[in-house]
């Protein structure tokens, strides 16, 4: 099982950080992401909302499974290429001094037919670096 855990404290109010990171368009701050957004048939932002992410060599269809603004939200990959067995991802937002501490945790495996551990050895560092790039872009955009 792969676990990716990244954290960053951003010098901006928790509500602004939450809103920025909960917007699927923020995912385009990742170097490999070409486009991201809610699907045409998605419910409004919140539980049940479905977003699609298209990146170099991959795509994801994710559903927001929990949405507690401005404290946390959780998502689950429903479909993807390459395939993921996703246990879920959660972003947690905690006030920290004059800013917000963001904790992002996701866990997954790849089925053996898709490359299993070999594919995980490739996706783990790629996804981790993209998560960090998204958090860095949030900080660059919002920090006072």
Residues of each region from the PLM?
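Short, cysteine-centered beta-strand-loop-beta hairpins and adjacent loop/turn segments enriched
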Residues: 56, 81-85, 110-114
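Hydrophobic pocket/interface hotspot
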Residues: 17-21, 27, 51, 64, ...
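Glycine-rich nucleotide-binding loop
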Residues: 97-101
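A conserved amphipathic terminal alpha-helix motif
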Residues: 108-144
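Hydrophobic ligand-binding cavity/cleft-lining segments
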Residues: 1-43
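Glycine-rich portal/gate segments that line the openings of hydrophobic small-molecule binding cavities
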Residues: 37-82, 96, 133-144
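Hydrophobic/aromatic beta-strand elements that line small-molecule binding cavities or substrate pockets
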Residues: 6-8, 61-66, 87-95, 106
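Hydrophobic beta-strand positions in extracellular immunoglobulin-like domains
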Residues: 10, 79, 106-108
């Amino acid at each position: 099982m792969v676990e990716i855990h990244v954290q960053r404290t951003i010098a901006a109010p928790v509500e602004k950080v939450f809103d920025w990171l909960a917007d699927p368009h923020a995912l385009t701050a990742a170097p490999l992401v070409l486009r991201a957004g809610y699907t045409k048939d998605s419910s409004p932002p919140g539980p049940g909302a479905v977003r699609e992410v298209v990146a170099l060599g991959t795509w994801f269809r994710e559903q927001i499974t929990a949405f507690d603004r401005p404290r946390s939200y959780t998502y689950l990959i429903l479909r993807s290429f390459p395939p993921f067995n996703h246990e879920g991802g959660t972003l947690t937002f905690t006030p920290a001094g004059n800013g917000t501490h963001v904790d992002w945790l996701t866990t997954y495996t790849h089925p053996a037919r898709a490359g299993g551990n070999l594919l995980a050895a490739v996706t783990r560092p790629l996804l981790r670096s993209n998560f960090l790039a998204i958090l860095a872009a949030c900080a660059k955009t919002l920090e006072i």
